[in-house]
């Protein structure tokens, strides 16, 4: 059993420049990205190893963190480090094209895959919640979800408001590592937003990083600001310190009609992520240590009231959707029978992108030099010249998104495009156009890397929502393809028992060997998403598979029968 030492009063920042601490760029990349996850400009609570998402950690405790760092510094290019729930458990001889790190976080046998059992293991030092990109060392701050949220809002605007969100406003809550992307995403999509957050420190952080424009003093002030800005068609994001379980029902009582309603509180984790109404944060954290069952029940009662208010907006005909935090399930558990009457964001707005393998492609400049990102932005535009929507995103991102930690960029691209971009970035490193290598990764929220029946795989047309073979196959294939590190997690986004998901990162160090790995990984990884959706019978995915020349035996057989 590992001793629990989860607080250390220090500050971690990733090394920058071209001088290596580790033995190669492959292991240096993992080292820098682990440290970048805990940069105070990136992580939500770095002194306790918490990156984002309630208790999503980068390492199990500080002893484990120190050993991971030591292991990465000394790791050879024919060795692989194994990480078990944030703990380095072994180093094995493999080969140069094998991953340098393999990570498994938070995985439990299904019968025991619940928060109660996980929390027992966590308290004993036997487990760690890795969220999605916290424990897989590829979190890039709120930018990591901005474009996905932006794409969701834009598509909602197309479906419900004729393609424009000018003069419209979004009601939501949660300004943590994920939810903090919402105000900026809404602004970039052309909408105003009212963003409720119960911790003033999180509002302060989003104001500092320019993800939120203004803070209202109270609800009346917030509504007055919304009225003023929507009347003039100006997109401004407004934060309000308060509890969503109190404010949303009050808005319903007042007859206020937002144009769109969603939520990104950390409702997936009632013990650590959702403040019961009438409580303050300090009381919540203290009682969580001594009365966990009471705290969980109180949080879920408040979630039920929160969802009842969302249902009221839905029943008014207002577009209302779950943004993947499992709040509907929590409310349903508390007797809100119609909690699932409003949809999740993936089936409502995002699935057609997933069918083409399009998802959150991200890269990070290990040099620490922002110019390296700006040069790659230009390369993306040059290689994908006809996608005006993508170009608009990159322009807005450069203007509005402040880098957190190592400079990074995200853009949603799909099968075919990812490998093209990765190979181009590798060539830029080789030629010296970029000052140091870059890493390419993605969120676990992607087209072929997650099984999550209340989020990414909700309402699959063949009923395969809960089949989790797909993320396992994705992880295995990325390992076989030579990704630099591969991760397989449980419970990210929606909590214990509700998801399994995998991630990968590949390093562009300018070498021929890297080019071969990049070509394999960045083709095969999104191809598994097309495969998964084609197997479920989505015509968009079947057509994409045919266009891209994927060899999918059963899909080909099915198409043959149809013809």
UniProtKB/Swiss-Prot annotation:
<feature type="binding site">
    <location>
        <position position="202"/>
    </location>
    <ligand>
        <name>NAD(+)</name>
    </ligand>
</feature>
<protein>
    <recommendedName>
        <fullName>Urocanate hydratase</fullName>
        <ecNumber>4.2.1.49</ecNumber>
    </recommendedName>
</protein>
<keyword id="KW-0369">Histidine metabolism</keyword>
<dbReference type="GO" id="GO:0019557">
    <property type="term" value="P:L-histidine catabolic process to glutamate and formate"/>
</dbReference>
<comment type="similarity">
    <text>Belongs to the urocanase family.</text>
</comment>
<dbReference type="InterPro" id="IPR023636">
    <property type="entry name" value="Urocanase_CS"/>
</dbReference>
<dbReference type="InterPro" id="IPR036190">
    <property type="entry name" value="Urocanase_sf"/>
</dbReference>
<keyword id="KW-0963">Cytoplasm</keyword>
<feature type="binding site">
    <location>
        <begin position="264"/>
        <end position="268"/>
    </location>
    <ligand>
        <name>NAD(+)</name>
    </ligand>
</feature>
<dbReference type="Pfam" id="PF17392">
    <property type="entry name" value="Urocanase_C"/>
</dbReference>
<feature type="binding site">
    <location>
        <position position="493"/>
    </location>
    <ligand>
        <name>NAD(+)</name>
    </ligand>
</feature>
<dbReference type="GO" id="GO:0006548">
    <property type="term" value="P:L-histidine catabolic process"/>
</dbReference>
<feature type="binding site">
    <location>
        <position position="197"/>
    </location>
    <ligand>
        <name>NAD(+)</name>
    </ligand>
</feature>
<dbReference type="InterPro" id="IPR035401">
    <property type="entry name" value="Urocanase_C"/>
</dbReference>
<feature type="binding site">
    <location>
        <position position="131"/>
    </location>
    <ligand>
        <name>NAD(+)</name>
    </ligand>
</feature>
<dbReference type="InterPro" id="IPR055351">
    <property type="entry name" value="Urocanase"/>
</dbReference>
<dbReference type="GO" id="GO:0005737">
    <property type="term" value="C:cytoplasm"/>
</dbReference>
<dbReference type="InterPro" id="IPR035085">
    <property type="entry name" value="Urocanase_Rossmann-like"/>
</dbReference>
<feature type="binding site">
    <location>
        <begin position="243"/>
        <end position="244"/>
    </location>
    <ligand>
        <name>NAD(+)</name>
    </ligand>
</feature>
<feature type="binding site">
    <location>
        <begin position="177"/>
        <end position="179"/>
    </location>
    <ligand>
        <name>NAD(+)</name>
    </ligand>
</feature>
<comment type="function">
    <text>Catalyzes the conversion of urocanate to 4-imidazolone-5-propionate.</text>
</comment>
<dbReference type="InterPro" id="IPR035400">
    <property type="entry name" value="Urocanase_N"/>
</dbReference>
<keyword id="KW-0520">NAD</keyword>
<dbReference type="GO" id="GO:0019556">
    <property type="term" value="P:L-histidine catabolic process to glutamate and formamide"/>
</dbReference>
<dbReference type="InterPro" id="IPR038364">
    <property type="entry name" value="Urocanase_central_sf"/>
</dbReference>
<comment type="pathway">
    <text>Amino-acid degradation; L-histidine degradation into L-glutamate; N-formimidoyl-L-glutamate from L-histidine: step 2/3.</text>
</comment>
<feature type="active site">
    <location>
        <position position="411"/>
    </location>
</feature>
<dbReference type="Pfam" id="PF01175">
    <property type="entry name" value="Urocanase"/>
</dbReference>
<feature type="binding site">
    <location>
        <position position="323"/>
    </location>
    <ligand>
        <name>NAD(+)</name>
    </ligand>
</feature>
<dbReference type="Pfam" id="PF17391">
    <property type="entry name" value="Urocanase_N"/>
</dbReference>
<keyword id="KW-0456">Lyase</keyword>
<dbReference type="GO" id="GO:0016153">
    <property type="term" value="F:urocanate hydratase activity"/>
</dbReference>
<feature type="binding site">
    <location>
        <begin position="53"/>
        <end position="54"/>
    </location>
    <ligand>
        <name>NAD(+)</name>
    </ligand>
</feature>
<feature type="binding site">
    <location>
        <begin position="274"/>
        <end position="275"/>
    </location>
    <ligand>
        <name>NAD(+)</name>
    </ligand>
</feature>
<dbReference type="InterPro" id="IPR023637">
    <property type="entry name" value="Urocanase-like"/>
</dbReference>
């Amino acid at each position: 059993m590992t001793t629990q030492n989860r607080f250390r009063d220090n500050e971690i920042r990733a090394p920058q420049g071209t001088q290596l601490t580790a033995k190669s760029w492959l292991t240096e990349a993992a080292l820098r990205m682990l440290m970048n996850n805990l940069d105070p400009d990136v992580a939500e609570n770095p002194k306790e190893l918490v990156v984002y998402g309630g208790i999503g950690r980068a390492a199990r405790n500080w002893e484990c963190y120190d050993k991971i760092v030591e292991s990465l510094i000394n790791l050879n290019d024919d060795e692989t480090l194994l990480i078990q729930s944030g703990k380095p458990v072994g180093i094995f001889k493999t080969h140069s094209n094998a991953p340098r790190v393999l990570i498994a976080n938070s995985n439990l046998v299904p019968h025991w895959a619940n928060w109660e059992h996980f929390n027992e293991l966590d308290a004993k030092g036997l487990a760690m919640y890795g969220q999605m990109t916290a424990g897989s060392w590829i979190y890039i701050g709120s930018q990591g979800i901005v474009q996905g949220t932006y794409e969701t809002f834009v598509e909602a605007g197309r479906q419900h408001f004729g393609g424009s969100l000018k003069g419209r406003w979004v009601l939501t809550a949660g300004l943590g590592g994920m939810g903090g992307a919402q105000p900026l995403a809404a602004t970039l999509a052309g909408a105003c937003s009212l963003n409720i957050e119960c911790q003033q420190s999180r509002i302060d952080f989003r104001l500092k990083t320019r993800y939120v424009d203004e803070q209202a003093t109270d609800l009346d002030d917030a509504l007055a600001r919304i009225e003023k800005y929507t009347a003039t068609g100006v997109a401004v994001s407004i934060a309000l310190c308060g509890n969503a379980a109190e404010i949303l029902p009050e808005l319903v009582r007042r007859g206020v009609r937002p144009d769109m309603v969603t939520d990104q509180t950390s409702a997936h984790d009632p013990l650590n992520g959702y403040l019961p109404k009438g409580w303050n944060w300090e009381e919540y954290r203290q009682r969580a240590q001594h009365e966990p069952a009471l705290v969980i029940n109180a949080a879920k009662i408040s979630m039920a009231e929160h969802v009842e208010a969302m249902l009221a907006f839905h029943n008014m005909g207002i577009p209302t959707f779950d943004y993947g935090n499992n709040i509907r399930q929590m409310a349903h558990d508390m007797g809100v029978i119609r909690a699932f009457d409003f949809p999740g964001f993936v089936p409502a707005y995002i699935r057609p992108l997933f069918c083409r393998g399009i998802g959150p492609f991200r890269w990070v400049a290990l040099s620490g030099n922002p110019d390296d990102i700006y040069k790659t932005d230009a390369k993306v535009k040059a290689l994908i010249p006809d996608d005006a929507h993508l170009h608009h995103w990159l322009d807005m991102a450069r203007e509005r998104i402040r880098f957190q930690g190592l400079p990074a960029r995200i853009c949603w691209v799909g099968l075919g495009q990812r490998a093209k971009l990765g190979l181009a970035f590798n060539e830029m490193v080789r030629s010296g156009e970029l000052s140091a290598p870059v890493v390419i990764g993605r969120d676990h929220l992607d087209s072929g890397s997650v099984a999550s029946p209340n989020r990414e795989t909700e309402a699959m047309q063949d009923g395969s929502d809960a089949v989790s073979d797909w993320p396992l196959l994705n992880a295995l294939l990325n390992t076989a393809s030579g990704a630099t590190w591969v991760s397989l997690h449980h419970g990210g986004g929606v909590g214990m028992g509700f998801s399994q998901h995998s991630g990968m990162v590949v390093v562009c160090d300018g070498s021929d060997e890297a080019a071969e790995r990049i070509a394999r990984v960045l083709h095969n990884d999104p191809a598994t998403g097309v495969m998964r959706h084609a197997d479920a019978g989505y015509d968009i995915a079947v057509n994409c598979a045919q266009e891209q020349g994927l060899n999918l035996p059963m899909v080909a057989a099915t198409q043959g029968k149809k013809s």
